[in-house]
Design a protein with these regions (language model features):
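Helical "lid/coupling" subdomains associated with nucleotide-phosphate turnover
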Residues: 1-46, 61-205
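A short acidic Gly-Thr/Ser loop motif
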Residues: 50-56, 113-116
Length: 205
């Protein structure tokens, strides 16, 4: 998304002699689908996979073990913190997209990916295979909002980079749960990096 992205990549490749490939949201979804995620989900149910980053968030719908659709939106933790003027428009687009593509899908649940949801899950002391409920996520969100930036660092032990972005990240997951009518969110220890390794091994990318 960076305006100087191509220039930056060229400079890195020149200095390191390492080729860099920039992937879009659609390809990212396919790479994630190639992970062992399929072993963790129930083939009879439907899931909305949400990967929250700093500048964008990827949404992928799975149902009965198949990838139905995927879309990347330019809204992430950093963009929300910066109060980007386009945020309101993008929020509406996300709500519409999720509502349309999860309509009619029963037994819906979220699958969360990203450093912030991993931290939230760790703080919950929940067992690895168990999900977090919408009620818990909402209560945790309200709890975080009441604390100052300094309190989130000193009392919760969050690092400085995490202490500010964890609130907008939680808002994204909560909104996705609400719009998809999901009552729980799973947080597996599988993500894009796992998919890249597996895809490279099998010659997919």
């Amino acid at each position: 998304d960076a305006s100087n992205g191509k220039k930056l990549i060229a400079e890195i490749e020149k200095e390191t002699e390492i080729n860099i490939e920039v992937i879009n949201g659609e390809k990212e979804a396919k790479i994630i689908a190639s992970t062992d995620l399929s072993k963790l989900i129930d083939g009879k149910k439907s899931y909305l996979y949400v990967d929250v980053g700093g500048g964008s968030t990827e949404f992928t719908v799975f149902s009965k073990g198949k990838l139905l659709c995927s879309k990347s939106f330019k809204i992430g933790t950093v963009r929300l913190l910066n109060n980007n003027t386009d945020n309101k428009i993008i929020w509406k687009e996300i709500k519409t997209w999720i509502s349309v593509h999860t309509k009619g899908l029963k037994k819906m649940a979220l699958i969360g990916s990203g450093g912030n949801i991993n931290k939230i899950f760790k703080m919950s002391n929940q067992r690895p295979e168990k999900p977090l409920s919408y009620i818990y996520m909402n209560a945790h969100y309200q709890f975080l909002k009441k604390m100052t930036y300094e309190e989130r660092i000193s009392e919760l032990g969050l690092n400085q980079d995490r202490a500010d972005v964890i609130i907008p990240a939680t808002k994204i997951y909560l909104s996705a749960m609400k719009w998809s009518k999901s009552k729980k969110i799973y947080v597996p220890k599988i993500g894009l990096s796992d998919g890249i390794v597996k895809s490279l091994y099998h010659g997919i990318i």
